[in-house]
Amino acid sequence: MNKKTLKDIDVKGKRVFCRVDFNVPMKDGKVTDETRIRAAIPTIQYLVEQGAKVILASHLGRPKGEVVEELRLNAVAERLQALLGKDVAKADEAFGEEVKKTIDGMSEGDVLVLENVRFYPGEEKNDPELAKAFAELADVYVNDAFGAAHRAHASTEGIAQHIPAVAGFLMEKELDVLSKALSNPERPFTAIVGGAKVKDKIGVIDHLLDKVDNLIIGGGLSYTFIKALGHEVGKSLLEEDKIELAKSFMEKAKKNGVNFYMPVDVVVADDFSNDANIQVVSIEDIPSDWEGLDAGPKTREIYADVIKNSKLVIWNGPMGVFELDAFANGTKAVAEALAEATDTYSVIGGGDSAAAVEKFNLADKMSHISTGGGASLEFMEGKELPGVVALNDK
């Protein structure tokens, strides 16, 4: 990686403003999934051991520039304290005189969690004044929030204009894994692109068709491709305005010598619920008043076979409505094939795919689960991430 990282700087006795991604799911004031907090621990632990004054900043949810009581970071700070096994202080603001006083009173190795940075309208606007106010709290900036790296915000990009800025260990690992996968992949290289809408994955499909040996399509977006082949899709999700684009992707795959896999059979239902009547049909025979909600058994077998014969697989987006057990088999089959393919390096691109491997208790069988859904998606589109560009070059 051509950006400076934590190991390139001395942090002893320094005030370190570390941007982490603690945007975790909450319920009734409790953290329900602490994966993102755990992911930041190696960087925080290292800063503590090196004798830095550790100042942690994160967003939580979408408070839209105002204080929302249930989006305060108190519960997150409590979980962090338990995971770190040491005291973690929590500030009521994210900058200003009171926060400065608290930081002045910190000893080497102390940890302070600032208040939710999105309580301030300047954060998402990347307001230079707010970026400066953040920078005044510290001597060094560390960005370990890969999940927010695709945002040019005051705490992810603006602050880096004012003080030395380096990548944390999680950021470094995410970038290393993804850039190695895209620039120097082991082959056969397979990408699995699922999810609901073609429009969200246009850039990814387009970019990956220049890189992969196999492209597997699944989920709601596959019905636009099925329609592009000339088949009726009943009440399935369909983007009429993307049919021509779907055709052009299939042509590009052919031109580039990419094996293009899409469903051959699907699970259709007469209602969007677990109790619906369901049947398996070939893609030529989708009934007019039913909707496709999952990949069928033949499709699952073909996809699993492609996965097991790949050296590298990147997976972004589920194969069906996996939140409903009746339509989870396609997504589960992909997750299980990846878990069983021990010679395959598997990269799970955050978001729903990460949630799926968690749901099926297969997370520990994946080689790398990205902590950033949107960020990994943009990286796979070949876009530069503002939070990374802003860091100091080696």
UniProtKB/Swiss-Prot annotation:
The keyword Repeat does not apply. The gene is pgk. Disulfide bonds: none annotated. PROSITE patterns: PGLYCERATE_KINASE. This is Phosphoglycerate kinase. It holds the Pfam family PGK. The modification Phosphoserine is found at S183. It is found in: Cytoplasm. GO terms for molecular function: ADP binding; ATP binding; phosphoglycerate kinase activity. Its EC number is 2.7.2.3. Pathway: Carbohydrate degradation; glycolysis; pyruvate from D-glyceraldehyde 3-phosphate: step 2/5. GO terms for biological process: gluconeogenesis; glycolytic process. Monomer. Keywords: ATP-binding, Cytoplasm, Glycolysis, Kinase, Nucleotide-binding, Phosphoprotein, Transferase. Its main location: cytoplasm. Belongs to the phosphoglycerate kinase family. Substrate binds at D21, F22, N23, R36, H59, L60, G61, R62, R118, R151. ATP binds at K201, G292, E323, G350, G351, D352, S353. The modification Phosphothreonine is found at T299. One of its GO terms (cellular component) is cytosol. It comes from Priestia megaterium (strain DSM 319 / IMG 1521). It catalyses: (2R)-3-phosphoglycerate + ATP = (2R)-3-phospho-glyceroyl phosphate + ADP. The lineage of its organism: Bacteria, Bacillati, Bacillota, Bacilli, Bacillales. SUPFAM superfamilies: Phosphoglycerate kinase.
